[in-house]
Amino acid sequence: MSYIKKLRARLDSGEISAVELTKEYLAKIKEQDKRINSVITLCEAEALKEAEDADAIISAGKQGLLTGIPILHKDLFCTKGIRTTAASKMLDNFVAPYDSTVTKNCKDQGMVTLGKLNMDEFAMGSTNEYSYYGAVSNPWDLERVPGGSSGGSAAAVAAGFAPISTGSDTGGSVRQPASFCGLTAMKPSYGSTSRFGMVAFASSFDQAGVLGHYAEDVAIMLDAIAGECEFDSTCVGVKQNHFTQDLEKDISGKVIGVDESLIKDLPAQIQEAVSKTLDNFKKLGAEIKSVKVPDLKEALSTYYIITPAEAAANLARYDGIRYGYRNPEARDLDELYRKSRTDGFGAEVKRRIMIGNYVLASSQYDSYYNKAQQLRKVMTDQINQIFTQVDAIFMPASPSEAFKKGDKLDPVSAYLSDIYTIPANISGLPAIAFPIGFANNLPVGGQLMAKAFNDNILTQMVVQYQKHYGIEEFILQQARI
């Protein structure tokens, strides 16, 4: 079950050329994205040139699995010669002089870059309402959010603008949008994909991820972008075909841990979807085992102390001098710094910078930042201990279905929507979200988390699940291939 393989067959048979396929997707984006607002920069000329190159490779019989396959990138991956904004006024005119490792790996595989995607500014948000370029709409219901921060990445694939997209995941930023938009998305183990050329939010949490309809497509794409990188010292890489190596194997004997206390207070329809999903895994031969997951509220508090601290340090580079927005009315250096950053950053980014600077202040450092780091270590050890008993841990991907725009503009309310996804980022573990049912006629997602660098177990389990139980009901008509 793979859109990439379906398109590969069409391209190889000559049913359609890469240029024709690219034109189809570009036309759909231009016609339909006005109501969704998922694309910041459409790369029409560049895409058609890349498609022509792909057709030449196909004609010569030298194509790979991804040659000529269209893709959309979250607009925090640097793309040489193309604007990279991170959805911020601060970088509105920034044209990257180099490619990120993620986008370069895609280009090297012959993929066609259709454009750059909307997101929460600097990846800070869970609703995609915090963008300089406006909020993104959920294709399932245009009055609702697509999730965040990779909301554009999820909305674009759900709307059929590309078969696959890249995103980043700092606290659930590919998995929560996937849950809201009926997609499959994965945050791989920390260090398996390079962060070089990826605009930084919180460096010890950030990781590139992928969103698509099918788990097999997600696995194929992660194999394409993963690997060692000489420009990222935290990138340890993974062996070739790490994500796709076990997709055909059944999951009989796999043990899935479930903490019932995380499910009992969910809305009834989501509880039903979770129960049905676990029953289906049992039918596939998996064993369900009761486990105790560390307190998620403590995880949330830890996350929202450490990540703003890292963000405050990372965003200090935007000073109005070296690059980025510069206020034209400043009369001296101090005013230039102050006005450029005040005007260039949105409200949510400024909120997190202020929190970060507060917890890093000498008077607060031990009370907040140090304690949060200690708790992060304790929680990571506790989660890893669970994996001595199980192969994966199952949780919901979000406590609700997609909510309406404006419903969670209160920051704390919005932060709570990350409660199930944050543990994987705190501990650097791989996690995959996939559609499991509906609540109020909107898709909801489940999530599996595994031990570090056991990513292949997750892709295997979800590919087998989707092979037996299908996901057609989660694919909107306009996105079908």
UniProtKB/Swiss-Prot annotation:
GO terms for cellular component: glutamyl-tRNA(Gln) amidotransferase complex. The keyword DNA damage does not apply. Its EC number is 6.3.5.7. Keywords: ATP-binding, Ligase, Nucleotide-binding, Protein biosynthesis. GO terms for biological process: translation. The keyword Iron-sulfur does not apply. SUPFAM superfamilies: Amidase signature (AS) enzymes (SSF75304). Heterotrimer of A, B and C subunits. Pfam families: Amidase (PF01425). The active site is at residues 74, 149, 173. GO terms for molecular function: ATP binding; glutaminyl-tRNA synthase (glutamine-hydrolyzing) activity. This is Glutamyl-tRNA(Gln) amidotransferase subunit A. Allows the formation of correctly charged Gln-tRNA(Gln) through the transamidation of misacylated Glu-tRNA(Gln) in organisms which lack glutaminyl-tRNA synthetase. The reaction takes place in the presence of glutamine and ATP through an activated gamma-phospho-Glu-tRNA(Gln). It comes from Francisella tularensis subsp. tularensis (strain SCHU S4 / Schu 4). Transmembrane segments: none annotated. Belongs to the amidase family. GatA subfamily. It catalyses: L-glutamyl-tRNA(Gln) + L-glutamine + ATP + H2O = L-glutaminyl-tRNA(Gln) + L-glutamate + ADP + phosphate + H(+).
